[in-house]
Amino acid sequence: MFYVDGYENCIKTVFLLACSHQQQTIDSLQKLKNQYICFLNKHFSETPIPTHGNLEQFCVDIERIKKIAVKHQGKGSRKPKIDLNTPLASMEEALSHVKNGQILLNQVNPSLGTIFDLVIHTLFYLRSPNARGGSTSDAPGTIWCAIKRHWTDMDTAECLVHELTHNLVVLDELCYQHYTDRSQLSNKKNYAKSSILKIERPFDNAFHSLVVAHEILRYRQEAGEPSNPHVHPPSEQMLSASLETVQSIKSVVDNTDLVQPRFSEILGKVETSLHQLEKSFQTVVVV
């Protein structure tokens, strides 16, 4: 969403969610984040965020982590295995690598780093044999970082961009509404092809995958193409899969009244941007 919508619009979305009914003046990002945390505590009270003292972005409080981890268990067949007995030493070691990825992200695009720090209030590590972490709409602003030892800092940075994007899409939907009837999203007749997994998935999951793939492609334009990526496919493969996802999603949209104008706006922006990327890739090949 950062590359789709821009820095100022990302801030605007957080402001509209958290401050639209506030009387006080919001004249700093820290004040905005404080109101954002209050908003999340009000609407997602099962995963409370501490408001006393300075909130540490890297969380090792196992009792708090357990409450968040429940929300990351997933639904259906894609349930991750989460090791709630992960030792503290493993958490601290993993989070030090996450910090290196976050530093790289900030170096590549400081504005993206600012949005990350505004939106993501909690990063935590728990081991998993079958997942690399994730985000959930049931606990916005959290990222489960089940990073792997063989990942480079570039891999970790891409993972953070990936999960930030999921969070930004969740906030955007909360603010503007994307769908006319969420109960129809998991109807198999409304499935669309994922850009990342390249399989048919529920409609909103496919849309998330498309926006994530777009953001990673745009991020790589600034960070460079990884020589041996472990988190996402090579860019040309991801671009091709993303264009297929666009057509798959449009096929559903054309045959239903499932989406709101905001959804169509984002889809149009992503499609235009992907075609621009396609032309730039073709130019590189020709040269």
Spans of features found by a protein language model:
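Auxiliary, metal-adjacent structural segments of Zn-dependent hydrolase domains
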Residues: 73-139, 149
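Charge-rich, solvent-exposed alpha-helical interaction surfaces
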Residues: 28, 35, 61, 104, ...
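Low-complexity intrinsically disordered segments
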Residues: 26, 140, 274-287
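Short active-site segment of divalent metal-dependent hydrolases/proteases
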Residues: 165, 169
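Metalloprotease/metallohydrolase-associated module, dominated by Zn2+-dependent proteases
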Residues: 113-122, 126-136, 148-150, 188-271
